[in-house]
């Protein structure tokens, strides 16, 4: 039994290191991108506060990931709860709506100048590894996101959809009232 557990944990570790392939994309006419979304590299388990800070500062609400984490980071969950991601910007005077998104919706919102926070799951089998990121661009091959420590990271559409689908396409739109 311990050998089986070791193999499962080893597989989890190896797969988690190679889940998403990304490359820096050259500019093309097909890129839809919001260039002025501030980027905050996340600290450990702080993808929620970093994502919120980027979008809220885009809307000229001066707040840092640390400010946000003080109010909504859950030590027991080692992360941020979805409902807190919605409530926090509302308390700061912004409209925030959580919904089930899709690629067409991402493109429409990016074209309208609305960066979106999405929740993806990089886990496998029964192991969840949820992660918030800010989608700042889309093109015919994938999405461009501020994610973790990567600004403007390209994620191929197939890889993105696979991880986003596991969260039932959780999407958060934040905008001015």
Q: Which residues are covered by each model-predicted region?
A:
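Short beta-strand segments that buttress and anchor functional surface loops
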Residues: 118-123, 145
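Noncatalytic regulatory segments and standalone regulatory/sensor domains
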Residues: 18-23, 115, 136-177
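Active-site-adjacent structural segments surrounding the nucleophilic cysteine of cysteine proteases
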Residues: 14-78, 82, 103, 122-125, ...
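Mid-length scaffold segments of soluble, non-membrane domains
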Residues: 70, 76-113
């Amino acid at each position: 039994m311990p050998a089986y557990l070791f193999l499962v944990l080893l597989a989890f570790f190896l797969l988690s290191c190679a889940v998403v392939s990304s490359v820096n994309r050259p500019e093309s006419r097909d890129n839809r991108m919001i260039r002025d979304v501030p980027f905050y590299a996340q600290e450990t388990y702080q993808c929620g506060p970093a994502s919120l800070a980027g979008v809220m500062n885009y809307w000229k609400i001066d707040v840092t990931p640390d400010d946000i984490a003080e109010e909504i980071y859950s030590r027991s969950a080692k992360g941020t709860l979805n409902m807190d991601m919605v409530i926090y910007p509302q308390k700061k005077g912004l409209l925030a709506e959580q919904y089930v998104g899709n690629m067409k919706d991402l493109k429409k919102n990016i074209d309208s100048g609305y960066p979106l926070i999405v929740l993806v799951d990089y886990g496998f089998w029964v192991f969840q590894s949820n992660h918030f990121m800010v989608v700042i661009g889309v093109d015919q091959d994938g999405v461009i996101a501020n994610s973790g420590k990567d600004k403007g990271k390209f994620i191929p559409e197939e890889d993105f959809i696979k991880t986003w689908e596991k969260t039932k396409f959780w999407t958060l739109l934040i905008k001015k009232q």
